[in-house]
């Protein structure tokens, strides 16, 4: 079992990897239904079923609420079940043949929702406004990150880093020829959440150095190999902060896993104004903290919407839908 994020709060707004990820699946179950309709709970039950059958699976968590699931991928069946409401996976690739839609809103009792429209709309506006501020702060954090890059760039030998990355990449043994992109870390209402399951049973190499040196190293590594998994940066998803290739892992943070080797990019130069770089790095942290504060307020608004819909749900009907989905996946 491994845990990831396929959507993230970034300096570019909400960054979605679902469309690319789901194209490789044999079947995709798309769950419709708004807040409080039990999508995450249903997916957790599917994961529990997969575990009871001894099947390997992945949990895809929500960056807006890391206690909640956005998806579950049963790897041994190559089937994914995902939240299909905006801003998640919402498109249908091949209806019925590949993609199957289940609407959990069908379990709502409309008679219990009389007179709540204005309240719900006001709470949704409030949530939207909080997210607008979230992305303003993260956009500012991204600008400071690139300021930091520009400062550090003056003191590192970029050509030597790229040449070294090329030599490392040549020794890798890729699995297949596809490139998978995902997040092991996310910017969430409680701060940053990070999982390290992908490092289990891997030879872990810790990559050290200034932020720009690591960016250059991983950018070059990602260009030179297929058959790898790229761990993207939450703040700047156009760059990666780690790579898995077969039994080898190159990461900036090994978490609780002991690293087997270390690559210190500091040997390629650190002749830049460290005080200026540190100031920009601190500004990244500060602006991200402001974003996290707003994310928490957005989550509170979301939870207040759920509180309206949960009492109107017929969860026994959800259980019937669950049985249909389990039959579809497990037979």
What does each model-found stretch correspond to?
Residues 1-56, 205:
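N-terminal accessory targeting/assembly segments
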Residues 1-20, 155-196, 331:
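N-terminal pre-Walker A segment at the start of P-loop NTPase domains
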Residues 28-47, 190-224:
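Glycine-rich phosphate-binding P-loop
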Residues 119-172, 281-328:
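An accessory alpha-helical subdomain
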